[in-house]
């Protein structure tokens, strides 16, 4: 009788056995897209600035950006952002858009605030991370923002976001 193997185990073995060389480019081509911008929100961390005290606690998230867009100085970047940074980013986007020739870009609502008592529970933090990831993917996926928003570039690539 054959031993049961999960799909992921089988795939992992196949990938390990596969050659690591990149396949030759074909005329039909599945090359890297001409222009791309990928963003991820992951690795939430809760910080305790005052030791064991709950005073001043906050959670931040790792924002990873991969792109080949000419308006982005770095091809790959990682920055940490708090929820309040996302709120500030949204306000800065509104201001930038109101001063530009494209004020009709719709910026979706951020995921809602969390009840104070539950904001550091793991499942609540994960739910917020998922919401922020979806929100940022939507915003960063807008073609007008990809090509013309200096605020988007700074939010995704500057170590400290100042708007």
Swiss-Prot record:
Q: Which SMART domains match?
A: PX
Family matches, as PROSITE patterns? PX
Output the Gene Ontology terms for molecular function.
phosphatidylinositol-3-phosphate binding
Write one Pfam family the protein is assigned to. PX
**What's the protein's topology in the membrane?**
Peripheral membrane protein
Biological process terms in GO annotation: endocytic recycling; late endosome to Golgi transport; protein transport
Function, in words: Required for retention of late Golgi membrane proteins. Component of the retrieval machinery that functions by direct interaction with the cytosolic tails of certain TGN membrane proteins during the sorting/budding process at the prevacuolar compartment. Binds phosphatidylinositol 3-phosphate (PtdIns(P3)).
Q: What is this protein called?
A: Sorting nexin-3
Species source reads Eremothecium gossypii (strain ATCC 10895 / CBS 109.51 / FGSC 9923 / NRRL Y-1056)
Its lineage opens with: Eukaryota, Fungi, Dikarya, Ascomycota, Saccharomycotina
